[in-house]
């Protein structure tokens, strides 16, 4: 099942939000030890098991949502079209994206769109791609790591001293001021 790891995390969050035990949720579906592995991303359940667990929690899995790649490209390039792209591709589908393989993408893009720049909870990190983790580190103010990870996945040009213009362009004024002074001396960016 595509996005099975993130499905396990979403199952765990929904189960804990309802204050359900693992044994109670998985009764008649799978063993509690197997559910534990699913929730940790250590086991890839069949689509049927995932669907049964999600259904019991009242959630509907969207297995093949429309790609959010245009939003990622607009965000990472610093394009002024990012807001319009987000409003077209993410906003109308927030509910279905929240229970899909693109749940982390939708939350990270929302953090930049809403200009709140709030990082995802740390429990999401083992399930993030390199690109997602690079943005997560930027949201956490861990700029050097964000640049290193972003360079590895070609999110932006490699720089040992400062992030690229695309990353800087997405920052709110408060986060921009948190950056090390040397990074804020990027040509064309007022300090």
What are these regions, as identified by a protein language model?
Residues 46-63:
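DNA major-groove recognition helix of helix-turn-helix/homeodomain DNA-binding modules
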Residues 89-95, 122, 151-153, 178-189:
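Amphipathic alpha-helical segments of tetratricopeptide repeats
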Residues 1-17:
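A short, Lys/Arg-rich alpha-helix, primarily the initiator
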Residues 18-37:
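Short alpha-helical DNA-recognition segment
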Residues 69-73, 102-109, 113, 128-136, ...:
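"A position-specific structural signal for the A-helix of alpha-solenoid helical repeats
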């Amino acid at each position: 099942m595509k996005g099975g790891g993130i499905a396990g995390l979403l199952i765990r969050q929904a189960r804990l939000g309802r204050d359900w035990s693992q044994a109670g949720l998985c009764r008649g579906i799978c063993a509690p030890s197997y559910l534990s592995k699913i929730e940790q991303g250590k086991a890839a359940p069949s689509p049927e098991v995932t669907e049964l667990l999600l259904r019991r929690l009242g959630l509907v899995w969207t297995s093949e949502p429309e790609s959010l790649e245009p939003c990622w490209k607009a965000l990472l390039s610093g394009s002024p079209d990012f807001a319009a792209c987000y409003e077209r591709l993410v906003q109308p589908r927030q509910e279905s994206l929240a229970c899909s393989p693109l749940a982390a993408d939708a939350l990270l893009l929302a953090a930049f769109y809403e200009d709140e720049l709030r990082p995802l909870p740390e429990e999401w990190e083992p399930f993030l791609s390199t690109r997602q983790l690079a943005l997560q580190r930027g949201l956490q103010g861990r700029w050097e790591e964000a640049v290193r990870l972003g360079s590895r996945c070609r999110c932006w040009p490699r720089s040992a001293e400062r992030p690229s213009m695309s990353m800087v362009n997405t920052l709110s004024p408060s986060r921009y001021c948190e950056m090390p002074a040397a990074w804020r001396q990027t040509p064309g960016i007022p300090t």
